[in-house]
Amino acid sequence: MVNRDNSIVALSFFMLFLLVLHLHFETTTAARKPVRVFGPPSSIEWSPPSPPKDDFEWFEINIYKNIEQTAFRPTGQGPSQGIGHKDPPGAP
């Protein structure tokens, strides 16, 4: 079994090794040329999009428009049935 003194010595050598390794790689990365993360700025000028045309080439008929308008009708048109009555219509 490993005693406490040996484990402390092994841990100390391991930490010393990590410190030397860290210092070595820190100096080698600092000696490298810096890497350009972003490229040079674009030379293309930005312009806003053109307004829509006045002619009807872009116009499309929405075939679903009538379906969308009448899609949800919970009751028939007009006043609600049974308002003002004690018993709603159809009650026994």
From Swiss-Prot:
Region (Disordered): 70-92
GO biological process, one term: nitrate import
Propeptide intervals in chain numbering: 31-70, 86-92
Chain positions with Hydroxyproline modification: 74, 79
Induction of the gene: Induced by jasmonic acid (JA).
GO cellular component, one term: apoplast
Entry keyword set: Apoplast, Developmental protein, Hormone, Hydroxylation, Secreted, Signal
Signal peptide: 1-30
Molecular function terms, GO-annotated: hormone activity
Post-translational modification: The mature small signaling peptide is generated by proteolytic processing of the longer precursor.
Protein role: Extracellular signaling peptide that may regulate primary root growth rate and systemic nitrogen (N)-demand signaling.
Similarity-based family: Belongs to the C-terminally encoded plant signaling peptide (CEP) family.
Subunit structure and binding partners: Interacts with CEP receptors (e.g. CEPR1 and CEPR2).
Protein name (Swiss-Prot/TrEMBL): Precursor of CEP12
Native source organism of the sequence: Arabidopsis thaliana
